[in-house]
Design a protein with these regions (language model features):
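Bacterial N-terminal signal peptides that target proteins for export
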Residues: 2-10
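Active-site neighborhoods of enzymes that stabilize oxyanions during catalysis
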Residues: 161-163, 351-511, 521
Length: 530
């Protein structure tokens, strides 16, 4: 029994690392003939369905390089038949759970209430992790992480007042599908199946009741193709891989069950980029192989672009991380050593003054002690020159400074100054801190796209008193046992290297109202109604 329990914990650690996508990928290449599929000539009663392929950490330059080298023929084919937008603004923090929540709800974290991959709940008085690194996995309650990731994220943490695209599709009387996406809440009842060894050896139940889209596929927990088993093995990350996603999408196509909207997530590129850096194209090549399998399910690629609309996109960029640990990493525990910081994996103690939640190149620092001065804490943080942004909230205002800076920027929503997205603001102080150019009461953003709204969204994403810090490109934040990506790359920050993603659209001449992920939802709903 002890062996079973230990093995189950190992399995939990492996799965809980999947959401972070920080583990090196060792999967074999995709075999396109692994599941024979009959060509589909009529896709149910849907006129022209939309298939959205989200490739984790897809960026413009490596995408173009993969196409130029002839190693991404499927993406090249769609590129030649569609419209390409190389710079779409992501959400903030630039972490998948927050970005996907923004895409599905059309709101920033101040409304959808998913602050990041890790955050502190003042209501539950505990840390929330939707994924973790291997060292963290030895200290954190893994069953709780799994429960948070597969159940609470969608069923309790994601704000019920912000409707997801799947919920709105259901209210319109239309079906939608989610394949391996992290955020998928909808209105149809489903049962997620927990692997038997894990449910027998941990407090986790054998089944979890959830609500999702009409068609829900989520790794080993729920699948559409009843005979697909190989891609759900432990060595294939329990189904959280590109091939599983592709085969599930191909199954819908071949059985004429494709709904008006299908959101399909290809996770593996993120792992390659984390390990090898932002210039690598190996993950894109693998994603392209998976995409080929989806296109082939139509019988030909020509039929694929004639019978469906295609949206291929990334969720965040990544910044290269320097190879030397001492230079690249900023240990928040050392900087904040005068304070008592809560220990990872342990209940919050009455004596604890701070909780730190790192999200790679960004962190939330929570003040638990009501007598602790955020101003004093910020002054201590300012001693570190590698901090790009340091922000706190005062009433309705966000106050911004930076490492080795003596100036501040204060702003709030509403006012006489307007930006490119028709958002209005009142701003005082040093505009250079957020690289803002203001002329004739109009804001032009620089290296922090949509900086005011995105930072405001994170600054108002949860209860409590806290600071937000991000680091300059080349650097990464660490605390107790948090993962690092030395010589590779990481994301999480507000900087453009983490924030800009490509968008490839085939089958429609329309585009989102603005080139921001927050505006994709309304556009996708319009496509579903055409």
């Amino acid at each position: 029994m002890r062996f079973k329990h230990t093995y189950a914990i190992v399995l939990l650690v492996l799965f809980c690392m999947l959401v972070t996508s920080c583990k090196t990928n060792t999967s074999p290449p995709l075999h396109q003939q692994s599941m024979p599929l009959a060509p589909s000539h009529s896709l149910s009663s849907v006129k022209k369905p939309t298939i959205l392929i989200l490739i984790d950490s897809l960026m413009d330059k490596p995408l173009r390089e993969a196409i130029t080298q002839g190693r991404a023929p499927a993406l090249a084919y769609l590129f030649a038949h569609g419209h390409y937008y190389p710079q779409v603004v992501s959400s903030f923090p630039t972490m998948s759970v927050t970005i996907d929540s923004t895409m599905l709800t059309g709101t920033y974290p101040n409304q959808h209430r998913i602050p990041g991959l890790s955050w502190y709940s003042t209501k539950e008085k505990r840390m929330i992790y939707y994924g973790m690194g291997p060292k963290e996995g030895l200290k954190i309650d893994q069953p709780q992480v799994l429960l948070d990731a597969v159940h609470h994220l969608n069923q309790t943490h994601l704000n019920r007042k912000t409707k997801t695209i799947h919920e709105e599709m259901a209210e319109m009387g239309k079906h939608s599908a989610s394949i391996n996406a992290i955020v998928w809440r909808g209105k149809t009842d489903h049962v997620l199946k927990i692997p038997r060894l894990i449910s027998l050896s941990t407090p986790l139940p054998a089944e979890l009741k959830v609500t999702g889209p009409a068609l829900l596929s989520y790794a080993t927990f729920a699948q559409l193709n009843p005979v697909q088993k190989e891609q759900r093995r432990i060595w294939r990350k329990y189904g959280m891989n590109d091939e599983f996603s592709a085969q599930e999408a191909a199954f819908l196509i071949s059985t004429n069950k494709l709904p008006p909207l299908t959101i399909t997530y290809f996770p593996e590129n993120d792992m390659e980029v984390h390990k090898k850096g932002p210039a690598t194209i190996e993950g894109i090549v693998k994603a392209d192989q998976a995409l080929q399998a989806v296109l082939n399910a139509f019988g030909s690629w020509e039929q694929a672009v004639n019978q469906a609309r295609w949206v291929v996109m990334g969720d965040s960029g990544q910044s290269a991380v320097l190879p030397d640990r001492r230079t690249a990493t900023i240990d928040l525990r050392s900087l904040l050593s005068p304070y008592r910081i809560a220990k990872i994996g342990q209940p919050i103690q009455r004596k604890d003054q701070l909780v730190v939640a790192t999200n790679e190149r960004m962190a939330y620092i929570y003040a638990l002690d009501a007598h602790l001065s955020l101003t004093d804490m910020v002054k201590r943080l300012q001693k570190e020159e590698r901090f790009d942004i340091i922000a706190v909230k005062e009433g309705q205002k966000t106050i911004v400074t930076a490492g080795k800076s003596n100036s501040t920027l204060s702003y709030r929503p509403g006012g006489a100054i307007k930006d490119d997205y028709d958002q209005t603001w009142t701003i005082y102080g040093d505009n250079k801190l957020l690289d803002l150019t203001i002329h004739n009461n109009h804001i032009t953003y620089g290296k922090y796209p949509d900086a005011l709204a995105r930072l405001h969204g994170a600054m108002n994403s949860q209860e409590g008193r806290y600071a937000i810090v991000t680091v300059k490109p080349g650097y990464e934040l660490v605390t107790e046992s948090s993962p690092t990506h030395l010589g590779g790359s990481a994301h999480g920050s507000l900087h453009e290297t983490d924030s800009l993603v490509p968008l490839l659209v085939v089958g429609t001449k329309t585009r989102p109202q603005t080139l921001r992920i927050v505006d994709l939802k309304d556009w996708l709903l319009r496509l579903a109604n055409e």
